[in-house]
Regions:
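Helix-loop-helix hairpins and the membrane-proximal interhelical loops
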Residues: 1-57, 130, 137, 188-293, ...
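Transmembrane alpha-helix interface/packing and boundary motifs in multi-pass membrane proteins
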Residues: 24-38, 68-80, 155-160, 254-266, ...
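Short helix-coil transition sites and intra-membrane helix breaks within transmembrane domains
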Residues: 29-39, 77-88, 120-124, 260-269, ...
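Re-entrant/interfacial helical elements at transmembrane boundaries that shape
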Residues: 38-47, 61, 76-96, 127, ...
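Membrane-interface alpha-helices at helix entry/exit sites of multi-pass transporters
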Residues: 55-59, 96-113, 284-296, 327, ...
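A structural-propensity feature for long, helix-poor, extended segments
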Residues: 65-76, 83, 293-318, 322, ...
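Membrane-embedded alpha-helical segments of transport systems
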Residues: 66-71, 112-124, 132, 176, ...
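Membrane-embedded alpha-helical modules
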Residues: 108-224, 335-489
Length: 496
């Protein structure tokens, strides 16, 4: 209770409150820009938080994370160009409704659904994270090794993506994590005689390159592309009848989003698609879906925002990212000298409550910005690409250099950007690479510690019940895509 009161009193400081509000405003703005995303913005902003106090830095990134998820719905509804991947499902019914002249109603419902989902997710975070951290007190290096392997295996289950491509992306991330000197044996790996690489490749320039650099190259080929948006008079609060129609959908999507968010490697995009599909499946009249059904907006918006707080649960309690953005927030914690896991809850309780409060404030703040400033955000989305993306690239270079004032980091960012762009062209996602990069170091470190504990015997893993549970879940998660593919082939066989 004392830690909560200390955290609460911290927000009476105009500086900390201003940081959260600024992060929220930036999140909505970035989320509303097609091509930009809260993940990219978090990666770009992370180096600039190094001079901040840990509480303010993590509160800023957490607020940006929450608000960016909602911000994507603005362009999804007005321009039919989702500002963030989780908002793609919102466009299915949001844009058709806006074309009918109800853009204000669509945005109002999106804001209300997002707030409900976001607050629900923060409650899940407050309740579940401490409970999970208590369980993690029983974890040693073998358990963390098995958990990290399970987290990597979850890449195969991400809905809508190729399981093989996700696993390849994760493997590339793990490979990048091995660059540098092995401090156990003193052997240099993949340094090619360059002493600057002996300490390894820092994950921040890689993150910036994969998200911002790759998107800069991609958008450079769209300089002549014009955007058009539907007219927007004012954002309107949904009526009682609108809420009544969508209430069960919102409640269901809150549960779906929170469950998806709790799973390592899953995120808002998966939750939004599932929220939309379930809203359509439970609807008695499905004829209006795709034509402007309110439930087609409420479902994905509640689900993707419900995933935000839930994705922070494994991030804070176990040190296993729940999504690409939480992987970057995890990186921010590490950069500030904070190790996520059970000890964080005993050693830094004020920081944790500050994160909870920041996310709670951000959810109310982005709704206010959505209602008051939607017309402004809608105009900003029409900024010409030739002005926007050079500025993003400059920020990427400055952010990468600011880390250690080394030109190597800028080159790493550029190479990562080229790699990310090439992989996008072949249908790969950047998120699995980030997950592999973050978890790769954990896998290697805990594996070596475990083998020392077991006197270099691999059979020692089989004597730990929790390890066996995680390894069984790993096999299951790896098998599910294969089973789904086999079922799909069997169904399509009679038709062909």
């Amino acid at each position: 209770m004392e830690a909560f009161l200390t955290a609460l009193s911290g927000f009476s400081d105009p500086y900390l409150l201003g940081v959260v509000v600024l992060g929220t405003l930036g999140g909505v703005l970035v989320g509303a820009m097609p091509g930009l995303s809260s993940t990219m913005a978090t990666a770009l902003l992370l180096p600039f938080t190094l001079t901040m106090e840990p509480v303010a830095a993590i509160a800023l990134l957490s607020a940006l994370y929450c608000a960016g998820t909602f911000g994507g719905s603005i362009t999804a509804i007005l321009v039919n160009a989702p500002g963030a991947p989780p908002a793609a499902a919102t466009a299915f019914d949001g844009y058709p409704l806006a074309q009918k002249g109800f853009a204000g109603k669509a945005l109002g419902l999106a804001a209300v659904s997002s707030v409900i989902g976001g607050i629900f997710s923060v409650i899940v975070l407050i309740v579940a994270a401490p409970l999970l951290s208590r369980v993690a007190y029983n974890f040693g290096p073998p358990e963390y090794f098995a958990l990290a392997v399970f987290g990597l295996s979850m890449l195969a289950t991400i809905s809508g993506e190729s399981a093989l491509k996700n696993l390849i992306g994760g493997a590339i991330g793990v490979l990048i994590a091995t660059v540098g000197m092995d401090f156990t044996t003193g052997v240099e790996r993949f340094t090619f005689g360059n002493w600057a690489l002996s300490e390894g490749i820092h994950f921040i320039p890689v993150m910036i390159g994969l998200f911002a650099g790759a998107e800069f190259i991609k958008q450079s080929g769209k300089l002549d592309q014009k955007r058009f948006r539907v007219p927007l008079d004012a954002v309107m609060l949904p009526t009682y009848q609108d809420i009544k129609t969508c209430l069960s959908t919102i409640a269901r999507s809150c549960g779906i989003g929170s469950f998806i968010g709790l799973l390592p490697a899953e995120g808002g995009t998966v939750a939004a698609m599932m929220g939309y599909n379930e809203a359509k499946r439970f609807a008695k009249d499905k004829s209006q879906f795709g034509k402007g059904d309110l439930r087609g907006i409420a479902g994905p918006e509640a689900a993707n925002n419900a995933a935000t707080g839930a994705a922070m649960v494994p991030t804070l309690a176990l040190g296993i990212p729940g999504s690409a953005t939480t992987a970057i927030i995890l990186g921010a914690l590490l950069v500030h000298g904070l190790r996520p896991g059970p000890h964080l809850f005993t050693e830094q309780p004020t920081l944790l409550y500050s994160i909870f409060l920041a996310m709670l404030i951000a959810n109310f703040a982005f709704a206010a910005f959505g209602f008051i400033g939607a017309k402004v955000f809608a105009r900003i989305t029409l900024i010409p690409i030739e002005y926007l993306w050079p500025a993003v690239f400059i920020l990427a270079c400055v952010g990468s250099y600011a880390l250690e004032q080394a030109m190597l980091d800028i080159w790493v960012m550029i190479i990562a950007g080229v790699l990310g762009f090439i992989m996008q062209r072949f249908g790969f996602s950047a998120a699995p690479i980030i997950m592999g990069l973050i978890l790769g170091k954990l896998v290697e470190g805990t594996l070596k510690q475990s083998l020392i504990i077991f006197d270099h015997s691999w059979f020692g893993f089989l004597e730990r019940p929790i390890v066996l549970i995680f390894l069984s879940l790993t096999l299951l998660s790896m098998s599910l895509p294969l089973i789904s593919e086999m079922r799909a082939r069997r169904r399509s066989a009679p038709e062909s």
